[in-house]
């Protein structure tokens, strides 16, 4: 697939995905969503990639939202299809077995906030702005905002942000738990890469199963979640990485890399 709006790069075991529509503040149109879907598939099938960083081109905007110029003439059926496409792509990103870090530079509004929330970890530049302003445009959040925001910041705060169409600064996003860390713009990508490299230095199977267990637990009762955790925990003992790491620990030496098996 020819990529016009998304850039995929690899730096060792880390994939860097850049949404590249700076003239449109990296707004998400249908073509960009389809390219994102393709890129996620490429990452899924690349065994060398163990972590992902998602960012936006330029310093002004991570993703300013869904593309209003495309949406304004949509009818009910077209709007529903657009929402289904966005939700499909964001859910696929969320379920990717490899941890995904959002490096949020500038505006993360509407679909931009929603795609950031689909990532596992969110690092924001100090000039970042977050919000779900859709009701001010006569629509609801359509790419998961009504569901993921409340899971991250609580129902009351999610309702306040969505009902008021209020945008918040990075430090407020940190305070309410929407982002993990705020750094200066010049340090954003370095910080994201530092975290990604810490992740890929650990046992990949254990990281993958930990992500699955956390995600599963958010969608079911505690007993079902704990049963899944026990299965994941047990599965780790079938891996070479577990044997090698525990042997190295007992022998008081550092393990010389994991094999991802």
UniProtKB/Swiss-Prot annotation:
The keyword Lyase applies. GO terms for biological process: butyrate metabolic process; fatty acid beta-oxidation. InterPro entries: ClpP/crotonase-like_dom_sf, Enoyl-CoA_hyd/isom_CS, Enoyl-CoA_hydra/iso, Enoyl-CoA_hydra_C. Signal peptide: none annotated. The keyword tRNA processing does not apply. Homotetramer. This is Short-chain-enoyl-CoA hydratase. The gene is crt.
